[in-house]
Amino acid sequence: MLKLNRRDGLLVLLHRRFTVLPPLIMVVLALVVPAEVRGQKAASSKIELKTTSFTPGGFIPKRFTCEAADVSPALAWTDPPPGTRSFAIIEDDPDAPSGTFVHWVVYDLPAAYRKLPEALSGNDQMSGGGRQGTNDFSRTGYSGPCPPPGRPHRYFIRLYAVGVILNLHPAATRKELDEAMQSHILARGELMGRFAR
């Protein structure tokens, strides 16, 4: 009789008296993929996402909010991993009273891009490539922080390196973007700023 024992994600066969099988068989068994990895892709790596528009973790200037010009911030990032075909960007506010509120959706940015300038237009089709989606204000492009009066809200900007060109329809929503890229994300980067009124 053999007894099956699972330990540390590897299958190990033991004799009834718990003597180990011959070394060659054990080596073969050790090649079994751990359970926590089976059916999953390797964890995505990180990209450093930077901005000159505000200090990460600090307060976002009014210029980038509904209280002033409401223009998009400048962004720059480091090289993505091999195989990157496009980039996507999502900005959201997880502290909104009604739940996470989406301020910016961008997708199919060319893989050669390493930055975006400040004050992009609100057009769906971006100059040089890429598209802007529909935010939770029901607008295309960027709509900056505009929280109700009170405590500061956090605004997360996330960049995704994507292994495909998504070819989503114009003005896609964050939900549609998430669903399209979920199994194609190769790396990601993140910034957070705060704003209060």
Regions found by a protein language model. Give the residues of each.
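Bacterial N-terminal signal peptides
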Residues: 19-32
